[in-house]
Amino acid sequence: ELPWHNGNCNCYEFKPVFLKHLEHNKMIENFFKKVLELKNVPRQGWKEKLEIDNLESVADHSYSTTVMSMILSDMEGLNTEKIVRMALLHDLAESITGDITPDSIRKNEKINKENIAMKQILKNLPNKIAEMYFEIWNEYQKNFTEEAILLHSIDKLEMAFQAKFYQNKGISKEKLQTFFNTANKEIKNENLRKILSNFME
């Protein structure tokens, strides 16, 4: 069971973890390096479809998605602390695997690669924290809780916003239409669908 008090509380029960040994500090440093590597991982969908410089990175996407998650979760009355953690973690495995698009690999193979990568990254953290982060990340992958379902929709909403950003920079709508279509198809939350509809007008 995940370590939040109950469904109505956004608080976690963890005692402070002090890094008393040099090897622990080195492990944390290794974790931070993986986080930083996301700045150099381009979002593969843009890379394949658009011929432009300075493509959005996975780190760019994760930050925007996290801010959107914080606001929209508060508006929906969900567990915002959990969804913010989930948003920060949801693409972390891509620091090792790269951004794998759904049509480039079988779904089970993609899940397996990302599962292995996430465990490799999290092994640098104290055990209880690593276990919690993996469970939150896995909750997103399974997509059965309210927070995970909302975040999947936000992930696509952020993609649509980024596509519109590129359109405003001069990229033709025709080149971006597949991204708008995907967002329209996969965003399930009605409030987010309204945001998307208003945004696209």
Name the predicted role of every residue range.
Residues 9-11:
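Cysteine-centered motifs
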Residues 18-201:
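Alpha-helical, largely C-terminal catalytic domains
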